[in-house]
Amino acid sequence: MGFRELFASSLGDAARAKASLVRGMSGWLNTTLATVQAAGPEIRACAYSALWAEVDSVKELVPLSATMLLNQLRADLKCAQVRAQKCTPASTSRFCSCGGIPLPGENKWEDELVPIPDCPVGRNFCRDGVFCKRHHGPGETLERVQVLVEAPKCPHCQGTGIIPRSEPMAYIRSEYERQTKTFARPSNPLHEWILEEGRESNHARRCSNWYHMSMSQIDKRDNDPCDASTWMAAAQILFDNADAQVYYPGSNYRKLVGGSKGYDDWCQLPPSKEMCNRLFDWWHRQNTPDYYVSEDTLADFVKPRMGSCHLPIEHDVHLLPREWHGRVSAGNTSHFMACLDGLSSSMEEFLDVFYDCAAQFNGDIEIFLDTNEKPSRVVGNLGGVRVLLTTPAVCSPAKLLPEIEESDFDQLEDESISCDSMIPPLFRDNGLSALYANLVLKQATVQSILMAHPDQDEIEDQVDHLENKQGGEIVTTPAFIKMLKEKRKEVRGKEFAEGSEGRLVRASDLTLSREDVFLSGGLFEKFRKSGIVQTFKGKDPKLTKVCVDLTNSQEIIKYPSKEMCSDSSGVHTGQVFTVLNRPLYNELNKLAESGWKEAKSVCLNLHIRSYVPVHTPLYAFCVIMWGHSSDAETASLCGAGVYLGDQEAAVLELPLVCSYLGNSLEDFDAYKRSLVLSTVFFGKSGLFAGQNVFGITAVEFTEYMPTSYGGITHERDSWQAMLRNHQGKDKGRFIAGFNVVDALERDKEEPIKMPNLDLEPVPRTQPIVRTFTGEGKQPLLNKSRSMRIQSFVSFRGSNIPVGRRIDNTAEAINYELGRASTSSVSSRLDESKCNLKAGGSYAFGETIELPATVTPGTVLAVFNIFDKIQETNTKVCSKWLEQGYVSQNLTAISHLAPNAFSGIAIWYIFDAYGKIPGDVTTTFELEMARSFDPHVQVLRDVSTSTWVIDFHKICGQTLNFSGQGYCVPKIWVIAASTFQLARSTATKFRLEFYTRGEKLVRGLAEQPLSYPIEARHLTDLNLMLAPKQIAVGTYAMITFPVSLAAKLQSTSGRTAYSYAAGLLSHFLGVGGTIHFVVRTTSSAFVTSKLRIALWGTVPETDQLAQMPHVDVEVNVDASLQIQSPFFSTANFGNSGSAFYVSTLCAPMAPETVETGSEYYIQIKGIEANPGLCREINYKQRFAWCLLECLDNSKASPIKVKIPSRIGNLSSKHVKVTNFVNALAILCATTGMHHGNCTIHFSWLWHPAELGKQLGRLKFVQGMGINNEHIGDTMCYNSLSNTHSVPFQFGSFAGPITSGGKADEAENWIEIQSPDFSWVASLHVSIEVHEGFKFYGRSAGPLTIPATVADVSAVSGS
């Protein structure tokens, strides 16, 4: 390496440093370098070469190699300043010890497959037994070659040499700036009354009165009132805002409310600085964006715990110069004591937070507890300070730190001074709370110094410490206290007011903490042993992290329909499998990104609340099973027999199963099914199938480990320490079990003997999820092995080991190998570079113009969701495109500003399957639009500007990016009414869509609507009745017939059925309770009061007041029972019940407003009484269509195809009459359908002599558009007139729409006849089998079917 390369490179400084090590070269090189660099390029090139030759010959320098330069550079970078991070106060970056220079690669010998070229014709070059393919050889051979393997990049700087600024440090700075930001005092225009009351004389009188009254009002003397300008600004806030309120300081709970009248509370506002500041805070929270108010807590630092500390302690307390005995100084301490009680409600949490603060200092302290487990004495050394605290007191943190002088510390550090006599009053009298405040304030000072010299390792250590200490996400202290309190409310004892005996459940029986579960090596155990928590130095591979997850809350277990056997003792049912929820995907992903690799389910606390009467002889055998094994003995992790006649029960079970987080994230669906609750019931018969039996709440204790080296070995038979607090007489929870801790609450009844049973494993047939992408499915298990349980006597001893068998069958091995997901790990997008304000959830948006004048039915906008997603190309859209489908529901937000006086309503329709005809462009009739269940935005109601698009509910599937498929998802924006108050100009508003909820399962909805249609399906209808208007000054009654299944017909002749009509058309009538919503859409200038009743006859005004009714002024959600002479109402015609809407007060409006009061009724659903729901007689068999010959006078050969989709048929060869029935309506009003049916054909021959009858019919089954794939064929002559064919409606992917063109891969039946004129008529009927499914919600038909050349299915009834 010559001087030319040396000085021209970027490492010139390091090269000079290396050369300066040679004696006498330093000054000469510097002078020469300056001289040569001042010359031109040619001279510099020659000078470098000449200088190097001269120096090499005279000085005999050793040539500077790359290795020598790398070693010197690393030595310079590994200095003490760099290690201590004090080389520079800048917080942007720091150097890495690798110097940015990659390590040298390594040469390795590898076997490489080298092809052997074929020998030319007539020649043979093959030798040594290796032949080419031409001479019948392999044509290739293995040769050993040397390959250079590059060294891995530095994990700290990725080869750049500079460690970037840490994200925790950036977060700390942003939080510090946010907390130190100040806001100006509100300066609202002052009312003349405020100015009058704020005059100097009036304000002086007010301050004088407040000085004498403050003792009785706030329990202390207020010697420092605010000035007049401050009081007037606060009083103006009360004057302007009727919903404002401010409480007096102290514990009297008095408050002042807002109002603008002369006798309202604004004139009673005292000149108190604290009350004025509270009003200013309230005003800023309402009007100032990003306003931040520090939370009230003792020792809370915003994540991570750094920043300003806010202690709600009395600020003006006189510290007594002598030690006092149990008395608290004067002043209001309720707020401080509330916070202290919140932390010390459990002594463990209080000491935990206390030690965390104390861990920042060297020393040791010892806390003594009294008989009530409260701190009574603290002795020790902390931060070089002697500590002796004997009495708790209240201190002023604002004055605490400045009042500590150096002399105080000098006295404390003197070992010769007696602790009891010479301790300064400041440290002796403040008690535990004073020590706590001192530590917190001192820690805040230390952290501010730390910000000037950031240490990456120290910041990461603190974050890791907080994560491991809290056992989950980093939360603030108030949030952590709130979580603990809510947790105790769930598991602690509470009074059962509605129980049969009103008894109390023992709190000790229902409380389980981490210390009870994680015995040895746990983090909290280390805290106790060390006394003071020390900051973790790096991530120890032996370190474990424990989490407590509320996996299932209020999960309902229903009584199964399958009964295995019965005897004189009772009935033994089949198994009911309930998947226990696991931590959410986002939480699991955060743990994996933080470095945790494995998760072990250690303990499962299963709490059971019985829904059967007390002392009912019903037992349940609950087993926690592993969902990834076909052998019942291997899958059965733990189980217990529970008596359900005692209302409350709980089981502590030990699954002890570990999973790898990487595979869990790749195949998250399989991870969610890893723990399954299997329940077998035994008891007296008489329970109905589907009846709620008991509910469960499962609390899972999980241990996370960074490597396989970490973790604690938990044994199922070594849990005596856990049982110490849960054992005793009458504390057993269950009757018998295996691999469980012990009995914790035994019933008072004697258990009966349960019969022998066979326990089956978790079924491997998961819910079928079909997609339109043709992806392969996982292999399903063909065989499983059950476990025979002969008696519960063997389980009486609790921890009874169960024998395990290894399932080595080929089917099981193939299944376990097939469990691995075929999907690759998707690359993660950078969360910090886009969508910061929306949290990364913004999907797309559309700008819509609202004209100044509109008519009802005006189409404001129509746009395709797919087009908008691809045009916007946000981070969410990129993720969907990578996954191949829309994986979350959408939340739509309309930014049309609220206006209570305009009196207009906007309808938003999600047409998922393109049912709205193409000829609808600028106007859409409201009678047709309301059949789509639109979302109504009322400008006078702010809450209606947001709604959710549920793809599984409305579409029946997730939207796929690989193609449009059957979905044509469009959003229609329609004006539903006119402006009741004239607008000055048109306006534009934004309609935005954000992602919402958990990740959807790819493919079809998991629980679609299926046959047979029952009364329980009527609970979710969402049926909108026609909007009505009552003219101003009109006192009348309007009737809405409850004929909910009738078709809708518009003035233009269009007909439509809603999804609710499709369900209700399966019933002649319904009875029960109707849940509905009444919304007022008129202007706020138009006011009225309505009374709504549901009755069978027209009621009188006095009768209306006595019967069940609902009074409506603006908006109301209500429920009314169907009242009629028949106890139910007809779904067709006007002979049933009706909504009677009567005006209690006729609509009123100002003189210039002449429009009436507009409102609409939306029926949410019907809580039907099954005994009052009369079903149609032909509920399983429906007439489809009738085929007739066009001309009987001549021969008419025909070929008519029946498609595999239900819809209106049309043809140019025959006359087609389509029938209307419940099945046709339901197919037309849903998105897709799929299932097995039987198609029945019946025909009628023209009357003729048998010998002259020449009629023939042929029924051909096939697949595809062309007649290439032919199935069964049946021919009939004049002696037959019926034919039945089992048939499956659907597409190659499963479900299919009710209209559209036939696919290339689709089943069909073709009717062929050489002369159809011999047939008078041919009827086609459909017999629906159980399990026929319907996906999505829509409306139809909205158009009249057009005549085409061939028979085709047209969407309709």
UniProtKB/Swiss-Prot annotation:
UniProt-listed Pfam families: Nepo_coat, Nepo_coat_C, Nepo_coat_N
Post-translational modification: Specific enzymatic cleavages in vivo by the P1 encoded 3C-like protease yield mature proteins.
Molecular-function annotations in GO: structural molecule activity
Single GO cellular component term: host cell nucleus
Subcellular location: Host cell junction, Host plasmodesma
UniProt KW keywords: Capsid protein, Host cell junction, Host cytoplasm, Host nucleus, Transport, Viral movement protein, Virion
Broad class of where this protein is predominantly found: host cell
InterPro entries: Nepo_coat, Nepo_coat_C, Nepo_coat_N, Viral_coat
GO BP terms: transport of virus in host, cell to cell
Family that this chain belongs to: Belongs to the nepoviruses RNA2 polyprotein family.
Misc: Virions are comprised of 60 copies of the coat protein.
Protein name: RNA2 polyprotein
Species assigned in the record: Beet ringspot virus (BRSV)
